[in-house]
Amino acid sequence: ETVSHVALRRIGDSLSLYCALGGISFSIDERNCLIIHAPHFSVKEFVTNDVVELVDSRNFRWIGRYDHVINTGGIKVFPELIEKKIAGLFTRRFFVTSCDDLKWGESVALVIEGEALSLEQEKIFLEKIRAKVNKYEFPRKVLYVQKFKETSSGKVIRNI
């Protein structure tokens, strides 16, 4: 992580805004990625790969990571937003990523930790997902991984 403790957000409310701490302020670059202005740090400006909706110079809503974006037929889809929409359907860990697609370049893939569902269970599960996401966000492929790899800090490594 580039910088820690520059903003706070209410716990448990993924739609609430992040609010700047102290003398911190924010702007965005041409990718809509967050730029942190921190006059009290030795490096005064940090450019991140976090795509945000900037409300004003002190408040933003986090959308996702620029380096995770899926470009499916020219439509940019953020895995983190899909994950928020479908999180309530899961009892096990999962993540959304991209997979190669001959027609669209990339498409959405759902990776689930643990044993594979039966074809019938998977079909029912995908219908529940379809009700929560738009057509560009719908997983075209479901993959199963016995155990997710993690970083030393416990974050899931999101590649397959």
Write out the residue ranges for each language-model feature:
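AMP-binding/adenylate-forming catalytic core of the ANL superfamily
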Residues: 44-137
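Short, ordered coil/turn segments that flank beta-strands lining enzyme active or ligand-binding pockets
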Residues: 30, 56, 103, 151-152
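Generic structural signal for well-ordered beta-strand positions
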Residues: 35, 61-63, 151, 156-157
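Conserved AMP-binding/adenylate-forming
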Residues: 1-59, 66-69
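AMP-binding/adenylate-forming catalytic domain of the ANL superfamily
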Residues: 133-155
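A short, well-structured catalytic beta-strand-centered motif of the EAL phosphodiesterase domain
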Residues: 51, 158-160
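General small-molecule cofactor/ligand-binding pocket signal
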Residues: 27, 97, 142-145
